[in-house]
A protein has these predicted regions:
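Hydrophobic/aromatic-enriched cytosolic interaction surfaces used to assemble or bind macromolecules
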Residues: 1-149
Length: 149
């Protein structure tokens, strides 16, 4: 199975000409790569989009046990002071609860919708949208990563 990975590096626009893409085979070997329209690779079923780190906000929250069942309802308000936009203007994604802690990623809904519309113009329907930071190894505590912007 092939996979298409598209990186959006521009923080200003989501114009197709500013995308870097790579098509990978099942062993993660590069089949093709380029910039802008991925052509035939746009029809790939497994599409992942990498957003610029500056477009997301990450937070680690402590959630009371009673609130866990209503996580999706209370997250927007738990992060209200730190959001990029008002609660109804953000898209939130919560990670797996680990004890009483949960990781949350936020992105402005307008930006995400605009990007998805631009991708649809190329017949691209991503299965995943993640930050470029999510691609860094996180299993080692003795390594630091620096992102230059």
């Amino acid at each position: 199975m092939h996979r298409l990975r598209i990186a959006v590096f521009s923080d200003v626009s989501v114009a197709g000409s500013e995308w870097q893409w790579v098509a990978l085979d099942s062993a993660n070997c590069v089949l093709a790569q380029g910039q802008g329209d991925p052509g035939q690779w746009a029809q790939t079923r497994d599409v992942e989009v990498l957003l610029p780190a500056s477009r997301l906000v990450y937070r680690q929250l402590t959630m009371p046990a009673a609130s866990r069942r209503q996580l999706s309802k209370i997250l927007p308000f738990a992060l209200e002071d730190e959001q990029l936009t008002p609660p109804d203007g953000s898209h939130l994604a919560a990670g797996v609860l680990q004890g009483d802690s949960v990781a949350v990623a936020m992105v402005a809904r307008d930006y995400l919708l605009h990007l998805l519309r631009r991708l649809a113009e190329f017949s691209i329907q991503p299965r995943r949208v993640v930050s470029v930071l999510d691609c860094l190894p996180s299993d080692r505590q003795d390594i630091w990563h620096v992102l230059l912007m």
